UniProtKB/Swiss-Prot annotation:
Family membership noted in the UniProt record: Belongs to the PdxA family.
Additional record remark: The active site is located at the dimer interface.
InterPro entries reported in the protein's UniProt record: PdxA (IPR037510), PdxA_fam (IPR005255)
Gene Ontology CC entries for this record: cytoplasm
Protein name: 4-hydroxythreonine-4-phosphate dehydrogenase
Co-factor(s): Zn(2+); Mg(2+); Co(2+)
Cofactor annotation remark: Binds 1 divalent metal cation per subunit. Can use ions such as Zn(2+), Mg(2+) or Co(2+).
Assembly: Homodimer.
Pathway this chain belongs to: Cofactor biosynthesis; pyridoxine 5'-phosphate biosynthesis; pyridoxine 5'-phosphate from D-erythrose 4-phosphate: step 4/5
Function: Catalyzes the NAD(P)-dependent oxidation of 4-(phosphooxy)-L-threonine (HTP) into 2-amino-3-oxo-4-(phosphooxy)butyric acid which spontaneously decarboxylates to form 3-amino-2-oxopropyl phosphate (AHAP).
Enzyme Commission (EC) number: 1.1.1.262
Binding site for a divalent metal cation: H164, H209, H264
HAMAP family the UniProt entry points to: PdxA
Length: 328
């Protein structure tokens, strides 16, 4: 059966619309329902010199593969005119509305997955809308106590214990309870969505040298090791905590299904240096499939035709792949 994939185009002044239009230049085996302003997409397509025909979305219609040069559109109204590369806080509610719609329709099973384009967190918050990121937004909307942010690139998958919080708050956020929640989600989702029979999870320490036996911090001794031992007793394959500065080596990576980093900038710089533009952000623990690009808004490239659609293409392919594994 053909899958129906929601796509949010993201910040309207960014490269998000450009990338969605670029994706439309090829045929896809799923129906692509873009949550965006139709006039914005048509104007951006004209600016880029790319053909685009928009097909109105009707939920009662059976999903059909997307023909090249077309997108199915779920229309949303902008509050202000869009200028490429220029943020306008008046359009922040528009951005969040597209996310709300995509999340709701996935939870009701009207859609089979959502792929999200880049948003600008700063301008959304400047508009008075509390927003720390897609991952956190969808988790709250779906009433999930915890979700896991995982980025996947060829040969490496990195999941995060904490996401978009200040570094000063990270140590307090790493508790036995949270380690249990995050690792259980990771273990379960790697089995159910990725088909891994017994996933092997390698865990980074929090402190330099994984605490050096308590001489450079006690979080490993007091919190992490007891929690990991409890989880091992439940049959989960865990290695660590290991020093993060030496963990990302071939001798470890060849055996690891995923690396669990303790904070955002511990694991993602390594992954992005190896596979930037080819990696996919996947949210685990939601009641539906969500993938995303691995980059930001790149405002300076909006409307220029220079934006690289590689990550968006990977994210869409991964969403279709994962959705195809789910029973209809």
């Amino acid at each position: 059966m053909t899958k129906r994939i929601a796509i949010t185009a993201g910040e309207p002044a960014s490269i998000g619309p450009d990338l969605v239009i670029t994706l439309a230049q090829q045929a896809w085996p799923a129906e692509l329902v873009v949550c965006a302003n139709p006039e914005l997409l048509l104007a951006r397509a004209a600016k880029l010199g790319l053909p685009l025909r928009l097909i109105p979305y009707h939920s009662e219609n059976k999903p059909q593969p997307q023909a090249a040069g077309t997108l199915t559109i779920a229309p949303f109204e902008l509050a202000a005119e869009v200028e490429c590369g220029v943020l306008n806080e008046l359009n922040s509610a528009y951005v969040v509305d597209t996310l709300r719609f995509a999340g709701e329709k996935n939870m009701s099973r009207e859609f089979d997955a959502v792929v999200t384009g880049p948003v600008h967190k700063g301008i959304i918050n400047q508009a008075g809308i509390a927003f720390s990121g897609h991952t956190e937004y969808f988790a709250v909307q779906a009433n999930c106590q915890d979700v896991v942010m995982m980025l996947a690139a060829p040969g490496l998958q990195v999941a995060l214990m904490t996401t978009h919080i200040p570094l000063a708050y990270v140590a307090k956020a790493i508790t036995r309870e949270r380690l249990h929640h995050i690792i259980h989600i990771l273990h379960k989702e790697l089995k159910s969505k990725f088909g891994l029979g017994s996933p092997k999870i390698y865990v980074c320490g929090l402190n330099p040298h994984a605490g050096e036996d308590g001489h450079i911090g006690r979080e490993e001794l007091d919190v992490m090791i007891p929690a990991l031992n409890e989880l091992r007793a439940q049959g989960i394959q865990l290695v660590g905590p290991l020093p993060a500065d030496t963990l990302f080596q071939p001798k470890y990576l060849q055996d690891a299904d995923v690396i669990l980093a303790m904070y955002h900038d511990q694991g993602l710089p390594v992954l992005k240096s190896l596979g930037f533009g080819k990696s996919v952000n996947i949210t685990l623990g939601l009641p539906y499939i969500r993938t995303s690009v691995d980059h930001g808004t790149a405002l300076e490239l909006a409307g220029t035709g220079l934006a690289d659609s590689g990550s968006f293409t990977c994210a869409l392919n991964k969403a279709i792949e994962l959705a195809s594994k789910v029973s209809n």
